[in-house]
């Protein structure tokens, strides 16, 4: 999963044994597992905070050895919307960068750098490719964070690299220090170099991204509105709908749309969800998300199955939650498929 690899590189490019990071708790399951368990074995600990926490609660999570703050623009699958300005303010007050996973929103709907983020990651396997045809990821550095100003905290960037002819990245590369270290050190030693074929397919996807994203968003809103009016549906979560918990944040950060993913639950709970998904014909049950074809998934038993009940709730994943990734098909066809699947 490239989203996990990107997050790993983004953090470990500046963190080492004995360090600490602060993360919003609403995360993709694999990313949560990476921060809660895997990098902990490497000596880097994470403190998870509720995305809706107060500024006081957020600041209390920082430690002397904190190296970064991490969050997702739109959490998968909780769809919690990240409050950039709140987290950026706290990160910069503690002299650390804000790193944001912008996979779901894409740069079409949200530009995190404009709201205080310093580094942005993407699983390009999702909307950027858009056709589930290639695997890839990206780390984008704004060049805005002044690593040299806090040299003792980020010594990997401000002191000589013995593995690279004694280069001091901040002196040699200036604003490009972070991304140069990531490619010349981490990628050199750990790999993750995209193949030419994957790069070619990704480039094709990027050429139509600006056309596809509005359709994804439009289909998501229309499907959410349909589900809201169905007698068998207990709840619907679509951040772009008025009345949603994070609607004000959407209007602030993503007024033109969020993404093509919505979530909902049925009154019959988990059993009803499984039954309904099995009856779908056009919409497939797929672990993948965010491409041209519509698909559904039950995250609690798939993408987030490694998490316990408490961790699931903290990540915003209810036991009955169905994740619905709307593609770019005709919305009337998609609604008709859902309608027949909900029939007794």
Regions found by a protein language model. Name each.
Residues 5-229, 237:
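Conserved PLP-enzyme active-site core in the AAT-like
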Residues 8, 108, 129, 244-246, ...:
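Flexible loop/turn segments at secondary-structure boundaries
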Residues 18, 29, 36-37, 45-46, ...:
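PLP-dependent enzyme catalytic core of the Aspartate aminotransferase-like
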Residues 146-147, 209, 269-272, 303-304, ...:
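Short, acidic Gly/Pro/Ser/Thr-rich loop/turn segments
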Residues 213, 221, 225-228, 232-322, ...:
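Conserved C-terminal alpha-helix-loop-beta "cap" of PLP-dependent enzymes
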């Amino acid at each position: 999963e490239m989203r996990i690899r990107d997050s790993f590189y983004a953090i470990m490019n500046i963190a080492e044994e004995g360090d600490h990071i602060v993360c919003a708790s609403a995360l993709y399951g694999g990313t949560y597992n990476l921060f809660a368990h895997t990098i902990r074995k490497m000596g880097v600990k994470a403190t998870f905070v509720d995305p809706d926490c107060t500024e006081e609660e957020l600041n209390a999570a920082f430690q002397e050895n904190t190296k970064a703050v991490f969050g997702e623009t739109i959490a998968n699958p909780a769809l919690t919307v990240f409050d950039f300005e709140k987290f950026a303010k706290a990160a910069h007050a503690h002299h650390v960068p804000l790193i944001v996973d912008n996979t779901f929103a894409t740069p079409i709907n949200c530009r995190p750098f404009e709201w205080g983020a310093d580094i942005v990651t993407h699983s390009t396997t999702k909307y950027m490719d858009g056709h589930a045809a290639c695997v890839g990821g990206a780390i984008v550095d704004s060049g805005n964070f002044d690593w040299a100003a806090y040299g003792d905290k980020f010594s990997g960037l401000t002191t000589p690299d013995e593995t690279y002819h004694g280069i001091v990245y901040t002196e040699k590369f200036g604003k490009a220090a972070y991304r140069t270290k990531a490619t010349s050190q981490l990628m050199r030693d750990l790999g993750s170099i995209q193949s030419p074929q994957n790069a070619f397919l990704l480039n094709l996807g990027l050429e139509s991204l600006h056309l596809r994203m509005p359709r994804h968003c439009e289909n998501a809103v229309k499907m959410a509105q349909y589900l809201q009016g169905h007698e068998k549906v207990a709840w619907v979560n679509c951040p772009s709908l008025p009345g949603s918990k994070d609607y004000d944040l959407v209007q602030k950060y993503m007024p033109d749309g969020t993404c093509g993913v919505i979530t909902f639950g049925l009154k019959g709970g988990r059993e009803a969800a499984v039954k309904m998904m099995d009856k779908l014909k056009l919409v497939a049950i797929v672990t993948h998300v965010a491409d041209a074809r519509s698909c559904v998934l039950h995250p609690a038993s798939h993408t987030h199955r490694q998490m316990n009940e408490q961790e699931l709730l903290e990540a915003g994943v209810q036991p009955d939650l169905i994740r619905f990734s709307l593609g770019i098909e005709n919305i009337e066809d998609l609604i008709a498929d859902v309608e027949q699947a909900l029939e007794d």
